[in-house]
Amino acid sequence: MRLSFLRQARVALEALDAAVDTVAAQRAVASGRVRISTSSAFGRDHVLPALPALLGRYPGLSIEVDFDDRVVDIVRDGYDIAVRGGNIPDSALVTRPVCRLNAVLVASPEYLAMHGAPQTPEALQAHRLIARRFLTGQVSQWNFKAEDGSITTLDPGNRAMLTLSAPESLVQAACDSVGIAEVGVHLAWDHLRSGSLKIILHDFHQPGTYEMVIQYPHRALIAPRVQVTLKHLLEALAADEKLHVPMDALDVYAA
């Protein structure tokens, strides 16, 4: 009860701040501090590169970015914007979709030259696997579609040669020929285009999609400093090629 009251009180105070900012905006450009929460890899590769242009356009802004792979309480922790994976239901938040992230199984040409490219999911039993462990302790499962349309699941953690938590580290390990890893297309894109990674089992692999969203507190008045930041981030992320690669465009990168 007390936490709920404090959360509602914070929303009310922030609405008051927004009203003050709106009045000020009638006389001046957007200015002030904007606090953003985002995950480490996505924030570094996609959010951070979008900020110089924003700051160049609005020099009165001060952007504070926290890189955190945990799910934060945007209202309680005082964030203006969160860029994160998964649509977390919360009546106090507005959710704007950014993209749907796809994943692929990859290995380096050197690894494939030494061990061969698996032609069926069952053949993975003879290969070196790199697994990802989430902060919750769970290991990411690999899903495959059989000829009859059924879905089979492989737990790479049972026999992984290497288990990592940071998604970008799986890409690096695959590039270093440690083994086969499931990674986000947006993380592997440059390596696929350069030829340093190849996609395997593309016709069988069924990774599903992971939705990236921008969320911000639901309020009647949104401060101009937050409005311009939201607009800029949505436009920048919509134009980010790596985040919108269609799956049928990946066939040319298959082993």
Region spans (language model):
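A ligand-binding cleft/hinge motif common to bilobed small-molecule-binding domains
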Residues: 171-196
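Alpha-helical "hinge/linker" immediately C-terminal to small N-terminal DNA-binding modules
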Residues: 1-25
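Ligand-binding "clamshell"
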Residues: 90-97, 191-201
